[in-house]
């Protein structure tokens, strides 16, 4: 028993045990209040176990001490029971705390580390790095705050609530693209049906009807959703099937499969092409070659006609000729006439960097062809794959491709019904085993077209454009000696482009002549500004060529002379033969040399030896080539006789010296003949040069008028 005095209440006498029980009651109430008030203590919850007590519980109200504050009770208890809390805290070896301190040292010992305090002072302070500052800012984000506690049912409930609260707080600091990731598993809070009816104040009499309507609407919505899902599923299935059919169609298309189809290993995809739109009617100017290939077409159409008599058609046909004469077009026409599959391959497509790729592609090509026999295999630029085999240690595997080609064409296994057509510009470079009978045992020459062939080709291409009725293809054909079919096609196309640029509705002879001059002499360069001195030198230089060509008996006729810069030259004189030349006589070769010398001779006679130019370099090259061929190839030297000297590097020094001496004699004699002609016709030379300075370009008729001493009409 003890007495307690206070200014507020009169003196009251209570037992000590009652006072202690009353003291514990408000302490527990205050702790629970403080725990619910602090959000941090929500995260650090500890399981509370309350043991049942049989003793009656007294509170301050029963004792008449309800007006005392908790702080006053703590102070009174500490004064009455000194060392109560201190002894209780010291008796335990652990310091329990629900909230973590700033450091592990403070959590363990209960006070700060002096060394850490000094280090955090201004004397030891360092500027934080960028990455360190970012990490320190991130650790304060709610999403990174750790939550520790015992895994009890109550703590689990509170942890789930705190997690949802942190996610809600994270929405304000997280970027927009992270919010969906953070909240992807958060479901929508659904309100129960009973709670909804209570909120809407629906009477109990109408609640059954409300539930029935809600159920019917839910079932209808489910049916509609199921129908929509089924429709989407069917649509996706249809699109997938269409995609598969599209890919299959691309792979089977003969024109697109080469690009889109891939094969296993290193073999390339091989697909035939039907040439139904190309026949022999499209081939002009090579009548003899077409007749040779008619036998192949007949065999492909009617093979029994030949097998009954015991005859066999050639397995391979070799087309030989200069570029642009129509070798590829002939091969396509053969396949088109016979209406059989056509396999095209270039000689450079077989070999690559990997060993054995060429032979593998040859096998693949012939395997596909045999499966689709009868058919035609056309190998363009055959010399690229079928060249002569030589001993070369750097590439010992380069001969595998040609050996495989030889075996496929005439090996142990026959290839009935497969016709191989090869095309090359250099038949002398092919291997001898490739062109023997049984492989390429038929050789067809495809030459440049003659006047008749050029006329047919020009008519064929002119019918594809709009041209004037005054256009005469024979005149253009006579002026395009040596042109191939491809060059004639280019001539007509250039004329059509010129007419379109000039705004004309159809092509006339003027555009065709312009196109011919552009091909023979090069395009005009009208923007080049040449001073009068160089223009005068060019006029006399070109006039010298024209005078020699006009007054030399066996020289080719003049087609046109111009001092307009064309291509790399400042002027040009075009010469064209009247008819096709199948052979050239010695006098014609000497005349060509004389015409080449005319430019330099004119410069020397008019301006002196100190003012000759470098413009005659190409003329000297042409004259030297003609003289060298006359001596070493044509046997036109009296001293060396009828003997050819193909490899001058293997000749003796005396023979080489004799060849050079003969070439030098021919060139000197040609130079003297040109000088004699220009001295004899000095007046005509001057008149022609002045006419070129006035008109810049003169054709054959205008040159003849000037040399006859007549005046030209004003243009």
Curated annotation (Swiss-Prot):
Regions of compositional bias (Basic and acidic residues) in chain numbering: 41-52
Gene Ontology molecular-function annotations: ATP binding; ATP hydrolysis activity; ATP-dependent peptidase activity; metal ion binding; metalloendopeptidase activity
Gene3D superfamilies, alphabetized: 1.10.8.60, P-loop containing nucleotide triphosphate hydrolases (3.40.50.300), Peptidase M41 (1.20.58.760)
Amino-acid positions noted as binding Zn(2+) in the UniProt annotation, renumbered to this chain: 541, 545, 619
Enzyme nomenclature, EC number: 3.4.24.-, 3.6.-.-
Catalysed conversion reaction: ATP + H2O = ADP + phosphate + H(+)
Gene Ontology biological process: cell population proliferation; cellular response to starvation; mitochondrial protein catabolic process; mitochondrial protein processing; mitochondrion organization; negative regulation of apoptotic process; neuronal stem cell population maintenance; positive regulation of mitochondrial fusion
Details of cofactor binding: Binds 1 zinc ion per subunit.
Catalytic residues, chain numbering: 542
Post-translational modification: Proteolytically processed by mitochondrial processing peptidase (MPP) to generate the mature form. Degraded in an OMA1-dependent manner in response to oxidative stress.
GO CC annotations, alphabetized: mitochondrial inner membrane; mitochondrion
Names of the cofactor(s): Zn(2+)
Compartment list: Mitochondrion inner membrane; Mitochondrion
Signal sequence interval, chain numbering: none
Superkingdom of source: Eukaryota
Coiled coil start-end: none
Keywords: ATP-binding, Hydrolase, Membrane, Metal-binding, Metalloprotease, Mitochondrion, Mitochondrion inner membrane, Nucleotide-binding, Protease, Transmembrane, Transmembrane helix, Zinc
Pfam families documented for this protein: AAA, AAA_lid_3, Peptidase_M41
Annotated PANTHER family: ATP-DEPENDENT ZINC METALLOPROTEASE YME1L1 (PTHR23076:SF97), METALLOPROTEASE M41 FTSH (PTHR23076)
UniProt function note: ATP-dependent metalloprotease that catalyzes the degradation of folded and unfolded proteins with a suitable degron sequence in the mitochondrial intermembrane region. Plays an important role in regulating mitochondrial morphology and function by cleaving OPA1 at position S2, giving rise to a form of OPA1 that promotes maintenance of normal mitochondrial structure and mitochondrial protein metabolism.
Quaternary assembly: Homohexamer; may also form heterohexamers. Exists in several complexes of 600-1100 kDa. Interacts with AFG1L.
Family to which this protein belongs: In the N-terminal section; belongs to the AAA ATPase family. In the C-terminal section; belongs to the peptidase M41 family.
Protein known as: ATP-dependent zinc metalloprotease YME1L1
Organism: Rattus norvegicus
